[in-house]
């Protein structure tokens, strides 16, 4: 820690903080130092803070009142994100990183936009792939594909997170999830909604970039695969979009994004979240020719932290909060309509069994 490094305060010290953000910050000790860690579980707060020589607390207000905390990172459960972003803005912090989603409704997002404008506080949302050098390189070179793409595919195959969390660090505590009765229409709808707002939301901003008519969302089909995940086929404006994920016991994760047009196509393969393995690799194909961008030396998590430092120091322009609201609005639309479709199909299947 030096006077030139930026002081970080972390709200929520669960697996994402322990296995992703702290290892990322350990690569950026010339830029950041962790000042204080807050968690509602005092044992977790103390354990995680001890790893980085930081103070700990169970009180959000105590962390926000700490003048050495210049940047606030919000890794708490989703339902607390909006109020904590607002509180951090009002506390006069230099920049805020909020894990996705940064709000659970459009009204909450609009309140954040108002407060951020009043306090002039820059905010970024932890959609890490939007900061990945592979994605950024693709943006510079995809040309008219952004308008000519007719098919978008976004796919995740995800082994159990704890396997990779344990490789990355010693996790102090994990939330426990009860078994779910997926034959209950409300439970099935909740699983789809949670999957989209918890997992798909990572790259829905990438999908939205290719879908200018993002408010025109039609769910063509929606399936809840075993053991967990989602398979959603959408029509977004004039684009066909497939968003899918499956949680499996396989060894290798796969996280891909594709945009396909008549004359060109893009495929991006992202590196695993829990491994400091460099950036995504983007391949743009135009006829028989291929252009490859990446992998670069760091991933999207490190990219978002680098950008956060520039925001705090005022060396880059803040992101347009309106765009963050549009990203959230699109995610909510997909989640709500997909949940409704699964609720209806599950109820219909139950009625058929009972007949």
Identify the function of each model-found stretch:
Residues 2-5, 71-73, 307-355:
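C-terminal helix-rich "cap/oligomerization" subdomain common to oxidoreductases
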Residues 103-172:
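A contiguous active-site-proximal alpha/beta segment in oxidoreductase catalytic domains
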Residues 191-192, 198-274, 295, 302-315, ...:
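Contiguous beta-strand/loop segments that form the cofactor/metal-binding neighborhood of enzyme cores
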Residues 1-52:
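N-terminal Rossmann-like dinucleotide-binding module
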Residues 58, 97-98, 123-125, 268:
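Hydrophobic residues in well-ordered beta-strands that form the structural core
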Residues 126-133, 164-214:
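Mid-domain beta-loop-alpha active-site segment that forms a flexible
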Residues 144-185, 216-224, 242-245:
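NAD(P)-dependent dehydrogenases' Rossmann-like dinucleotide-binding region
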Residues 52-115:
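Beta-loop-alpha module in the N-terminal Rossmann-like domain of NAD(P)-dependent dehydrogenases
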């Amino acid at each position: 820690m030096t006077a030139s490094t930026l002081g970080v305060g972390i709200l929520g010290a669960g697996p994402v903080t322990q296995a992703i953000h702290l290892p990322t910050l350990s690569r950026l000790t010339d830029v950041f130092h962790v000042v204080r860690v807050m968690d509602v579980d005092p044992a977790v707060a103390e354990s995680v803070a001890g790893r980085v020589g930081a103070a700990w607390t169970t009180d959000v207000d105590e962390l926000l009142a700490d003048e050495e905390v210049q940047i606030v990172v919000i890794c708490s459960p989703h339902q607390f994100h909006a109020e904590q972003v607002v509180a951090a803005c009002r506390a006069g912090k230099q920049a805020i990183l909020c894990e996705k989603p940064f709000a659970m409704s459009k009204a909450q997002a609009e309140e954040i936009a108002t407060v951020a404008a009043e306090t002039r506080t820059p905010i970024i949302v932890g959609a890490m792939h939007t900061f990945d050098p592979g994605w950024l390189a693709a943006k510079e070179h995809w040309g008219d594909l952004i308008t000519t793409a007719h098919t978008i595919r976004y796919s995740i195959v995800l082994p159990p997170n704890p396997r990779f969390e344990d490789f990355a660090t010693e996790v102090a505590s994990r939330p426990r999830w009860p078994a779910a009765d997926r034959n209950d229409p409300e439970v099935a709808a909740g699983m789809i909604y949670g999957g989209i707002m918890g997992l798909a939301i990572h790259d829905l901003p990438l999908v939205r970039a290719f879908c200018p008519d993002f408010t025109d969302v039609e769910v063509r089909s929606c399936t809840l695969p075993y053991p967990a995940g989602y398979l959603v086929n959408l029509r977004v404006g004039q684009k066909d979009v497939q968003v899918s994920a499956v949680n499996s016991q396989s060894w290798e994760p796969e996280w891909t994004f594709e945009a396909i047009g008549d004359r060109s196509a893009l495929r991006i393969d992202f590196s695993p979240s829990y491994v400091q393995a460099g950036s995504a690799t983007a391949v743009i194909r135009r006829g028989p020719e291929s252009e490859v961008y990446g992998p670069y030396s760091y991933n999207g998590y490190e990219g978002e932290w680098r950008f956060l430092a520039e925001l705090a120091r005022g060396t880059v322009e803040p992101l347009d909060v309106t765009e963050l609201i549009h990203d959230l609005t699109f995610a909510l639309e997909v989640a709500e309509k997909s949940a409704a479709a699964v609720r209806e199909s599950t109820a219909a299947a139950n009625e058929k069994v009972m007949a």
